[in-house]
Amino acid sequence: MDPIREGEVAHEGDSVYTLNDFTKLEKIGEGTYGVVYKGKNRRTNAMVAMKKIRLESEDEGVPSTAVREISLLKELQHPNVVGLEAVIMQENRLFLIFEFLSFDLKRYMDQLGKDEYLPLETLKSYTFQILQAMCFCHQRRVIHRDLKPQNLLVDNNGAIKLADFGLARAIGIPIRVYTHEVVTLWYRAPEILMGAQRYSMGVDMWSIGCIFAEMATKKPLFQGDSEIDELFRIFRVLGTPTELEWNGVESLPDYKATFPKWRENFLRDKFYDKKTGKHLLDDTAFSLLEGLLIYDPSLRLNAKKALVHPYFDNMDTSKLPAGNYRGELELF
């Protein structure tokens, strides 16, 4: 539990922190961007998550563009976005200090019993809160790009928060994480898988669709082990896209005319529990999912539209961290 040695450079901000202001307690994980430690703010005694960012070119130091971009993320203050409290540079290393939450959505789902599903009201509440956070960030032109259950953190009061916003653009997504585990493709939008150079907020909406489906079934919807396998798993469930439903798909760099032509859509079958004979998503929930998994990114539901989908009509928002926020810019 030794204090970290004095940082030479601290972030600019209201309270200037150095690494000496934090005590490392234990390593809690290895994320997409490097090692994560549980730590303590020695000024406030609050628990924090300390991310030591692994940079591809450590010998060259931290790119100033990355520091600038990351510093902007301190402005993303929303009750459903994990707060970035400080950006600290030490030599050529970068530490990001975040508020601490001990549990992520994946661990929460993993500890449910074998035949136990997420309660329907929790499924709805979590989905709504994820969309609230996404809408807030998208309106500020920040795309997540690497959304998955591991970077959705939950607390004991029914809140869910998005972590690692904007880091994909600031740092880039590595192919592998620290442990040489391949960064998951299961939540990646088809336009990225087919090599689109320019993409939009729609990539996050696709990821939310995949996460919504997984919260309902406890199983990843498209569990590919390579980019082409991921793509074909999507095609097998939704049908292979054509120019008819996705204008421009055949012009994408990695589109191949030789792709197998699956024609049927089997999405509904994924939500049928054979044991109980029940559908895990009702018609309005399924309609929201279909809107999030539209192939053409320009037709895919955006976060603001998703927040007013009929699925959320009877939503009790009184106890949610961001209340009834549905994309009104002036709220935060």
Curated annotation (Swiss-Prot):
- Give GO cellular component annotations, separated by semicolons: centrosome; chromosome; cytoplasm; nucleus
Regulation of activity: what does the record state?
A: Phosphorylation both activates and inactivates the enzyme depending on the site of phosphorylation.
Q: Name one Pfam family in it.
A: Pkinase
Please tell me where this protein is predominantly located: nucleus
Against PROSITE patterns, the record matches this protein to: PROTEIN_KINASE_ATP, PROTEIN_KINASE_DOM, PROTEIN_KINASE_ST
Q: Which UniProt keywords apply?
A: ATP-binding, Cell cycle, Cell division, Chromosome, Cytoplasm, Cytoskeleton, Kinase, Mitosis, Nucleotide-binding, Nucleus, Phosphoprotein, Serine/threonine-protein kinase, Transferase
Give its E.C. classification number.
Answer: 2.7.11.22, 2.7.11.23
Which residues are the active-site ones? Answer: D146
Biological process GO annotation list?
Answer: anterior/posterior axis specification, embryo; cell division; G2/M transition of mitotic cell cycle; meiotic cell cycle; mitotic cell cycle; mitotic G2 DNA damage checkpoint signaling; nematode male tail tip morphogenesis; oocyte maturation
Q: Name one GO molecular function term.
A: cyclin-dependent protein serine/threonine kinase activity
Entries under PANTHER family matching the protein: CELL DIVISION PROTEIN KINASE (PTHR24056), CYCLIN-DEPENDENT KINASE 1 (PTHR24056:SF334)
**Could you give the subunit structure recorded for this chain?**
Forms a stable but non-covalent complex with a regulatory subunit and with a cyclin. Interacts with cks-1.
Q: Which family does it belong to?
A: Belongs to the protein kinase superfamily. CMGC Ser/Thr protein kinase family. CDC2/CDKX subfamily.
According to UniProt, the name of this protein is: Cyclin-dependent kinase 1
- The protein's organism comes out as Caenorhabditis elegans
The top of its lineage is:
Eukaryota, Metazoa, Ecdysozoa, Nematoda, Chromadorea
Gene transcribed to yield this protein: cdk-1
